[in-house]
């Protein structure tokens, strides 16, 4: 086989070659004519015809292979691009000993250029600063309400509680002002995550309060008098308890005497009875305090009979 130097193939030439691709019959006729020119005086034998057919078939397969890989759609993508310094082109050609037809393949790869990084600032006067929109009073209230919804950490709560305690101890005693603001925002010194809106109560229809400043001696004396008034004497309490106990004991004695009045009493009738009476033998026993029964018992003893009423 004889290798021919193929010209450089570009994207445009490859497209034109694909458009002008010969058919199988034309390549077969070209191969037959060339074989006849190479062997003058000899008739086309069977071996010559087979060789020509094999060469034509091989050329046709090469043409189909080239047409498959180099389509017009692919060639059109290279039309707008010019081969740059980074483009590489490689070509290879094959030719048969039986004909002058040659097939070439070309591959070109283009590397995209990277955009340069801007390292300089374009000179010129800076543009006007955007105007700040005026804040509405409603926006601040909404922001405070959003802060109320945010959860506070336990450390911030503890710090705020301690700061409020120490601030209350250090603050001097000042009279409450009657004309206070209607609404005031209060927040701790350590954390601004929580805020509350407090409204001072109105002082209309209430009694006026007065504040007096006293010296340390006067203040101690006033406090001692108040304590003495509140203190109850111990001796008075003891006397009251003793009187109460005596009254209770007297009531108990009265109740016991009333209960003993129903019991029997023994009287010595022998001292007043005449001599030789029956009272000397035994004493009358009264088991009741009823006067009618006592008289009946005494009447029975007066007749010389001894009777015991059960």
Swiss-Prot record:
Gene Ontology terms describing biological process: auxin transport; auxin-activated signaling pathway; gravitropism; positive regulation of auxin mediated signaling pathway; regulation of seed growth
One term under GO cellular component: plasma membrane
Keyword set includes Transport: yes
Key words of the record: Auxin signaling pathway, Cell membrane, Membrane, Transport
Segments of this protein annotated with the region Disordered: 81-141
Location(s), subcellular: Cell membrane
InterPro entries, alphabetized: BG1-like (IPR039621)
PANTHER family the UniProt entry points to: PROTEIN BIG GRAIN 1-LIKE A, PROTEIN BIG GRAIN 1-LIKE A-RELATED
The protein's role, per its UniProt record: Involved in auxin transport. Positive regulator of the auxin signaling pathway involved in gravitropism, plant growth and grain development.
UniProt family annotation: Belongs to the BIG GRAIN 1 (BG1) plant protein family.
Name this polypeptide is given: Protein BIG GRAIN 1
Originating species: Oryza sativa subsp. indica
